[in-house]
Amino acid sequence: MEVEMEFAGRLKKIRIKLIMIGICLIFLGGYSLIQEWKDQKKNTTKKVFDQYTDAFFKENISTNEITMHFFLENPEKYRLEQPKNLYPSMNQGSILNEKIKISKEIEKLKKFKQKELTKKQQNTYMVLMDYLRRQKNLSMYPYYERILGKTSGQQAQILLTLSEYRLKNEKDIKSYFQLLKGLDGYFDSLIEYSKEQVKRNLFLSDQSLKEVLQQIQNVIKQKENNMLVATFNLRIADIKGINAAQKKKYCRENKKLIGTKVLPAYEKLYSHLQALNGNGKNENGLYYYKNGKEYYKVLVAQKTGSDKTIEEMIEISDRSIEKCLRKLIKLQKKYPNIINEYRNHKKI
């Protein structure tokens, strides 16, 4: 009897152990399934994030012809089609759409859990989020941007951009000609933007406008010695696969388009801007516009990518300049003729 009871007790213990082992196996199996599901989810998140950044790049690089051509030599490798727009648009509709788009992109990005991304993806996430947030802050001041200027204005910079437009084949030449033909439309958006600035008391000072008008006038006067003629002739000379006769034909067409499309576009821009003379309410800097101080802070943060205050940046700049001056003084003491030798391009 005692033996039977002892045997039964052992069986009971064995059953309990087996049940515990079974529970552990179920738990471990469930845990591994959960872990596998989590790993799959992480891999899916990584894949979706790569798809998102790829789409973001393609969409932003192909907004207009001049931007895409500047950044990509072979856009077909990215399966990008020819952009519908030739130039960036500065009209009211596009400005509003850009503001909405930035907010949507931020919300899309927020949906990704950073801990499920690789370190490289996390860095991309942080850089992109920082960029979008700074752009969003800047979009709150849509008509504060100085789009016109003697040298840095878009009416001046577009000449440099066109003169450096990459020409590798006939397709590039034809795209370039389309840009010349579409310059008038681009300037129309600058005119519209400037008129909106007038309404908001954000237009250029009369002195700044005078300098812009002088720059435009100088372009108009250069009918024969226009930089777009000289630079085009140099660039097309290096293109292989086009015979001499065809190159001459393209050079003549370029010169004709400058006379019939480019210069008239500048003349129209000059006329419209001249009519806005006297509307500049601020002869000082951005700070002196309504909300100018706030805009300046946002602009500096966007341009530098830093969250330091203006005062902190000035202090850092001053220290850096002072450090450079001390080094220069030491060098001049050691090499008394260093400045003259530098000016004469002699080896020190």
Annotate the PLM regions:
Residues 1-4:
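Short, Lys/Arg-enriched N-terminal segments with co-localized hydrophobic residues
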Residues 23-27:
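Hydrophobic core
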